[in-house]
């Protein structure tokens, strides 16, 4: 995309926007709220909007009181390690390194052409179209905002490694689309999904508005991007695990396991960083962000799943998204909002957050030998965001 398209993502701060959906499925509009509309707490008492209240939005001056954010003259030197939990996340990520060249797609085209029907191909290609753009959006936030805002070197190491692995995810998804979709115009339409597919454009708009917002605190934007990686990705991961359950598309499903593990680690890390903040937004503020992300994700699956498939439909997927959202809310210190069960039996033993058994399993030998040996094994803490067990 050339520079002439940049105005597509100049998000209005005061007013939301209707995103048109233009496809053979028909035309409809998805409304993406402005940040002001998200936090429309006009009927709430002033007391509840103060720090400690459920509707506290935070203040920019709070950040000068945050150890992880205030100017740190020692940020250029890594040792001695002061934040061992954060450093452990970096070492886990480092030990999990992989490349797109390790994914074998040689058997996938046979399944794509002969074992998936047209509705299933539409569903999976829509999922991949979102994924192909989403990692670039996550990286823009890391490059433009989080990496420069956070002042402790341990966290900067995590963000730096995340930028690299998100590039590998983006390369992998682009490679998958390039392999499966062979008609040139259709292929380009999927690569341009944040401009051509309304529900994907809405997800992109929602994420990009937080990057562009100069008023929201780091804490609020941390919750928003935990939602991007923990909610906007979760249903799409589940859709590919659904193929794995059926024994289809081994290259796609293997890459999905690796990427799901990585993104789970990123979501866990967001929750850990949130726990390190002294001035956190109120519970209702966190809830408003998560619930809004869920609503947009449900709109997305209305488009991605226009018909019911075997063991997969829009209603089940929407319930699964609510289930995962509750787990994220709890990991951020909130109560559950939806109180629903996991509708997918094939996701019972999968964590979206790098749960220890999933991390150690590594699908094969994807933990680089020796990387973890120099660090103390972190004990399981209260910030692990799982999608299978009840609290």
UniProtKB/Swiss-Prot annotation:
Fe cation 2 binds at residues 166, 229, 263, 266. Its EC number is 1.17.4.1. The active site is at 173. One of its GO terms (molecular function) is metal ion binding. This is Ribonucleoside-diphosphate reductase small chain. PANTHER family: RIBONUCLEOSIDE-DIPHOSPHATE REDUCTASE SMALL CHAIN, RIBONUCLEOSIDE-DIPHOSPHATE REDUCTASE SUBUNIT M2. Pfam families: Ribonuc_red_sm (PF00268). Heterodimer of a large and a small subunit. Its main location: nucleus. It catalyses: a 2'-deoxyribonucleoside 5'-diphosphate + [thioredoxin]-disulfide + H2O = a ribonucleoside 5'-diphosphate + [thioredoxin]-dithiol. Keywords: Cytoplasm, Deoxyribonucleotide synthesis, Iron, Metal-binding, Nucleus, Oxidoreductase. Belongs to the ribonucleoside diphosphate reductase small chain family. GO terms for biological process: CDP metabolic process; dCDP biosynthetic process; purine deoxyribonucleoside triphosphate biosynthetic process; purine nucleoside metabolic process; pyrimidine deoxyribonucleoside triphosphate biosynthetic process; pyrimidine nucleoside metabolic process. It is found in: Nucleus; Cytoplasm. Provides the precursors necessary for DNA synthesis. Catalyzes the biosynthesis of deoxyribonucleotides from the corresponding ribonucleotides. Fe cation 1 binds at residues 135, 166, 169. The gene is suc22. GO terms for cellular component: cytoplasm; cytosol; nucleus; ribonucleoside-diphosphate reductase complex. SUPFAM superfamilies: Ferritin-like (SSF47240). Its cofactor is Fe cation. Binds 2 iron ions per subunit.
